[in-house]
């Protein structure tokens, strides 16, 4: 694992590179970061399938999850590549998405979805 100080440095670097002040990647307890070869024809789709299975598994254990895709276009930015190298992501890989995982706030009230019972067909 990485120290809290190292995690803070990584978060600040991502925030700065994205030019999104205050961006905290949803304050996850953990992040799962699949990657794939840059030249892989189905790399993005393979990563999406892996992430969806991670989300389903997390949900089955009561763990909240959210997709984070901000790294896919900045993987080759030197500061971000340094972070990816630290995590062991090969230089010829792209991170198309990440799973941020954590426990939902128990005080959050989830509003029921309104079911209107209609289907719209567009031809």
Provide a role label for each language-model segment.
Residues 79-93:
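Short, structured secondary-structure boundary patches
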Residues 1-6, 10:
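Single conserved hydrophobic/aromatic residue that forms the stacking wall/gate
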Residues 20-23, 55, 85-89:
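A generic local secondary-structure boundary/capping motif
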């Amino acid at each position: 694992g990485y120290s809290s100080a190292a995690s803070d440095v990584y978060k600040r670097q991502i925030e700065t590179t994205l030019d999104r002040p205050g961006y905290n990647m949803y304050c996850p307890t953990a992040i799962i970061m699949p990657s794939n070869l840059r030249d892989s024809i189905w790399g993005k789709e393979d990563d999406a399938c892996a992430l969806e299975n991670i989300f389903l598994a997390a949900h089955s254990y009561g763990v909240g999850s959210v997709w984070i895709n901000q790294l896919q276009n900045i993987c080759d930015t030197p500061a971000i590549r340094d972070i990816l190298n630290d995590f062991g992501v090969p230089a010829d890989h792209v991170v198309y998405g990440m799973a941020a995982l954590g426990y939902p706030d128990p005080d959050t009230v989830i509003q029921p979805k309104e079911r209107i019972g209609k289907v719209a067909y567009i031809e």
